[in-house]
């Protein structure tokens, strides 16, 4: 199931919708290029050195997930733009939604795991559990990635079952839009089943992300206060350096939470494909996802070096 499911009879396309569609495609293309660059840069390093840090393994996995997601989004939205009144559970959209559900859940889980990794590796907490995790965490990355794939697969399968039930019911009714039983089943699944699955499966990693990011920020603020008092002569230089270091982290938090909220609101709205609101939600969601790869490109040391070499 995607964010818009109601079919209307109108075949006309509003100019505003066309504009939003073009903006959406351009945003997705920028995200594809940004994530593709991350994949190539880190992938080349992995091939040349035969090794990659745990942090960069998470980054390349997140970039790959986002790269594929943006490609699916482009394909799906081109299809629904050209076929705005098609049945939203037909086999083509079912396949696109299956990939969208999997990749969206995978992206959320990978962001959550990246936040957990940042907290454990960067936080200055001295609790024995954190000290123990610092040494154990790099070896857990493959299992973390596998768990993200598993949870994402579960989400997509559960949503696909609901999509398939609606399509089968629609096919049995002879594709009649006024079939009361079919419409009742569809509205019930859209209102309760799909939304509940996505809220649960998206909220769990978001809560994990929020907890560990809060711990990290508290730890960093405490550390900054102590250092600020100790280095009275270099306060301006020190403050500027720490602000630059904190900016990517803060942007990651803001963009992740913004993307989560827009996904939830978009799923709750159940807007028809050809309506202005559907395309507006799509633009807002993917505006959040296009900014973070750019932040990563200019904040990650490995990627920054590649960019500088490319510009020279």
From Swiss-Prot:
PANTHER family cross-referenced by the UniProt entry: TASTE RECEPTOR TYPE 2 (PTHR11394), TASTE RECEPTOR TYPE 2 MEMBER 60 (PTHR11394:SF32)
UniProt-recorded Gene Ontology molecular function terms: bitter taste receptor activity; G protein-coupled receptor activity; taste receptor activity
One GO CC term, this protein: membrane
Residues annotated as transmembrane: 20-40, 67-87, 98-118, 141-161, 199-219, 245-265, 278-298
Membrane topology designation: Multi-pass membrane protein
Location(s) in or outside the cell: Membrane
Main localisation: membrane
Species name: Mus musculus (Mouse)
Role summary: Putative taste receptor which may play a role in the perception of bitterness.
Any one Gene Ontology BP term: detection of chemical stimulus involved in sensory perception of bitter taste
Cytoplasmic topological segments: 41-66, 119-140, 220-244, 299-312
Keywords from the named record: G-protein coupled receptor, Glycoprotein, Membrane, Receptor, Sensory transduction, Taste, Transducer, Transmembrane, Transmembrane helix
SUPFAM superfamilies recorded: Family A G protein-coupled receptor-like (SSF81321)
Parts of the chain on the Extracellular side: 1-19, 88-97, 162-198, 266-277
Source organism superkingdom: Eukaryota
More info: Several bitter taste receptors are expressed in a single taste receptor cell.
Sugar-bearing residue positions: 179
Protein name: Taste receptor type 2 member 135
Family, per entry: Belongs to the G-protein coupled receptor T2R family.
